[in-house]
């Protein structure tokens, strides 16, 4: 698990990253800049329980690809979920809050992930445990904002102009961020590579 000091603002950006691409980098960097985060932990997951693992590359390969895509002092690629045998994001959040009680964690996700967030194991536990930053992705804006999770959490949504305050907000709290977008997707890249 990466080190963290009390008072730090750390974004948690989990995904299969199969493969990672510029769209992921834009989500992470938009959140980091707009929220004033000290670090973004790129949590390379052993596998998304809601996705087919048939074409999932080995975790070491995906972790190396994230390191190559997101070098620099603010990006921290990690596969600690695999080492701790964690399957669900809610368990990741619970572990991090126990290990680092003074750290201000923020869950980061692309808008495309928000559309299915209500299908995640214990999603409401995640939403009430830490603030959430949702970064716009092409083709997601209108459909995502009418999805289950944004409707259930609508009264806890911060205006985009208050994004920098999100890491210190008591959950549930979330913000929808707009910024540069990329049409690249992992599915498209796998298709182009014949996977």
Across the structure, where does each feature detected by a protein language model lie?
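Nucleotidyltransferase catalytic core that binds NTPs
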Residues: 1-195
């Amino acid at each position: 698990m990466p080190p963290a000091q009390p008072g730090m603002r750390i974004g948690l950006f989990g995904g299969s990253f199969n493969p990672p691409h510029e769209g992921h980098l834009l989500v992470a960097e938009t959140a980091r800049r707009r929220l004033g985060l000290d670090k973004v932990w790129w949590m390379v997951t052993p596998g998304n329980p809601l996705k087919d693992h048939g074409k999932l590359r080995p975790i070491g390969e995906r972790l190396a690809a994230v390191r190559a895509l997101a070098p620099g002092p603010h990006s921290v690629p990690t596969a600690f979920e695999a080492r701790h045998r964690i399957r669900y994001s809610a368990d990741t959040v619970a572990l991090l809050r126990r290990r680092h009680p003074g750290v201000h964690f923020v869950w980061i996700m692309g808008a495309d992930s928000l559309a299915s967030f209500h299908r995640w194991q214990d999603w409401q536990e995640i939403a009430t445990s830490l603030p959430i930053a949702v970064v716009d992705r092409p083709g997601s804006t209108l459909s995502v904002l009418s999805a289950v999770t944004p409707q259930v959490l609508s009264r806890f949504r911060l205006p985009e102009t208050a994004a920098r305050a999100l890491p210190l907000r008591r959950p549930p709290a979330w913000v929808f961020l707009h910024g540069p977008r990329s049409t690249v997707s992992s599915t498209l890249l796998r298709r182009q590579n014949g996977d």
